[in-house]
């Protein structure tokens, strides 16, 4: 039986800016400094892990919290806020019990009760076929109303979902509207099975392919081109026997290479997959992928030589010092028909310590020019001595937003202030413009001086300055991922968000 706690553990991931928010509500007419262009009309959705109750696991990681979804409605130069928890099975049962019931991260053997679905729905939120989908890669999505943020329930695509898991990073084809997805550990914890599937814009499954990974390990993100799908395997491995003994789901494996699984996007069979190999390293989020003129695959992603998830060390307990971890935007180029599966050294696109890469999604799966991401550059002037007491811990620190131009190799940097750190950006296309990268970048910013959150809006034509700063009267915990949805895609009911 789990211990009932009356307060959150005295740990960095539950203190300072990371102290759980536990807030639901609406705020209209947020304060705006500067000017929001009236042509911007849509909703910025994002989700943060935000435990409603103290966990009974003392050192619970920050991203094991309940999914709390935020909707920022922007229209007519104004901004409003709405936030609701995803009513998962976990959330509802713990609310009724008035105590935590979920045990260690992705370890059902440590739970206080048996769950049908353990999802926290806390990693990403995307809009598809009229529904908002709250995603966690160990389970099916939860569907939410995009206006009210009311939870509709667990969503299996009307009984079509073939796997027990669904990626938190589905890819959308900007030409066909197709959603390309997969699930790993797709037959349950500790299984090597990967299930790949394509979904039509109206929600019909068009193809299902089962394949077997060379190791039971994490596949957090993936990449899609016109004709191929790529699965980067992170060398964090699962051992079901370790889990049964109360251990962690994941353990860093220095002996395991980075695998890139490559399979045809259409008409594939499981045995068609090729597992290309690179030295032991940590592949992060993908920026984009496409096919060059020779038919080679070009895959741009974050890469670190060290274990980015340092809180899950190797079998001997070895883990890197967090401040020593450096992730760079790199480019792998490979021939999908090659017999030699050894990957060449990737090209470093940007030397800086970066992550959370976003592009103009209208150019996804195709050759592209512009990439936007979080960057940590200590030389910019962040006052770490001042903000350190309020930082909390357990989450990645980035102090600026960057725009990298693939054509010129040049980088522009926006520095939000010496007491600020940034979260993942999203790109907003300029209305009626078809030019790649013509629009705005929007990101949530942590202000450690005021202990409140802000939205910073940058015009890509003047990237180094904020066109508008939208201030919240509350603090939002560091989140994971989100998306921008055009108001025309949601419909006229979006005025209810104002």
UniProtKB/Swiss-Prot annotation:
Binds 1 Fe(2+) ion per subunit. Dioxygenase that cleaves the interphenyl C-alpha-C-beta double bond of resveratrol to yield 3,5-dihydroxybenzaldehyde and 4-hydroxybenzaldehyde. Also cleaves piceatannol, a compound that differs from resveratrol only in the occurrence of an additional hydroxyl group, which leads to the production of 3,4-dihydroxybenzaldehyde and 3,5-hydroxybenzaldehyde. Trans-resveratrol binds at residues 105, 136, 355. Its cofactor is Fe(2+). PANTHER family: BETA-CAROTENE DIOXYGENASE (PTHR10543), CAROTENOID 9,10(9',10')-CLEAVAGE DIOXYGENASE 1 (PTHR10543:SF89). GO terms for molecular function: carotenoid dioxygenase activity; metal ion binding. This is Resveratrol cleavage oxygenase 1. Piceatannol binds at residues 105, 136, 355. One of its GO terms (biological process) is carotene catabolic process. Its EC number is 1.13.11.-. InterPro entries: Carotenoid_Oase (IPR004294).
């Amino acid at each position: 039986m789990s211990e009932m706690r009356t307060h959150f553990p005295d740990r960095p991931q539950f203190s300072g800016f990371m102290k759980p928010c536990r807030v639901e509500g609406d705020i209209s007419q947020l304060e705006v400094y500067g000017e929001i262009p009236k042509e911007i009309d849509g909703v910025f959705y994002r989700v943060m892990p935000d435990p409603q109750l103290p966990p009974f696991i003392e050192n619970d990681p920050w991203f094991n919290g309940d999914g709390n979804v935020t909707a920022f409605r922007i229209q007519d130069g104004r901004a409003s806020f709405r936030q609701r928890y995803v009513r998962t099975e976990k959330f509802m049962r713990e609310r009724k019990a008035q105590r935590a019931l979920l045990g260690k991260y992705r370890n059902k053997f440590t739970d206080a009760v048996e769950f049908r679905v353990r999802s926290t729905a806390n990693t990403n939120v995307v809009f598809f076929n009229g529904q908002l989908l709250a995603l966690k890669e160990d389970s099916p999505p939860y569907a939410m109303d995009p206006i009210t943020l009311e939870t509709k329930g667990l969503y299996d695509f009307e009984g079509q979902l073939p796997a027990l898991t669904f990626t938190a990073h589905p890819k959308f084809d900007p030409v066909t509207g197709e959603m390309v997805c997969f699930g790993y550990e797709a037959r349950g914890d500790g299984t090597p099975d990967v299930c790949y599937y394509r979904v039509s814009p109206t929600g019909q499954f068009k193809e299902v392919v089962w394949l077997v990974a060379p190791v039971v390990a994490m596949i957090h993100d993936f990449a899609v081109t016109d004709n191929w799908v790529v699965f980067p395997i992170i060398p964090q491995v699962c051992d079901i026997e370790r889990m049964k003994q109360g251990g962690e789901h994941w353990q860093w494996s220095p002996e395991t290479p980075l695998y890139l699984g490559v399979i045809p996007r259409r008409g594939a069979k499981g045995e068609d997959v090729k597992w290309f190999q690179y030295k032991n390293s940590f592949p992060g989020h993908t920026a984009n992928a496409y096919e060059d003129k020779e038919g080679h695959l070009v895959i741009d992603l974050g890469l670190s030589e060290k274990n980015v998830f340092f809180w899950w060390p190797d079998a001997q307990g070895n883990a890197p010092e967090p401040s020593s971890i450096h992730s760079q935007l790199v480019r792998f180029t490979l021939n999908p028909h090659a017999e030699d599966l050894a990957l060449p050294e990737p090209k470093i696109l940007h030397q800086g310590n970066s992550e959370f890469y976003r592009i103009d999604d209208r150019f996804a799966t195709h050759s592209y020019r512009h990439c936007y991401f979080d960057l940590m550059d200590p030389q910019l002037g962040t006052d770490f001595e001042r903000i350190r007491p309020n930082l909390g811990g357990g989450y990645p620190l980035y102090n600026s937003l960057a725009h990298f131009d693939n054509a010129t190799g040049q980088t522009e940097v926006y520095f939000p202030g010496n007491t600020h750190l940034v979260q993942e950006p999203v790109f907003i296309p300029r209305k009626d413009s078809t030019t790649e990268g013509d629009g705005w970048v929007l990101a949530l910013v942590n202000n450690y001086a005021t202990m409140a959150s802000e939205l910073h809006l940058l015009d890509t034509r003047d990237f180094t300055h904020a066109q508008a700063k939208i201030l919240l009267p509350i603090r939002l915990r560091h989140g994971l991922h989100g998306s921008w949805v055009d108001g025309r895609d949601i419909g006229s009911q979006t005025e209810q968000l104002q």
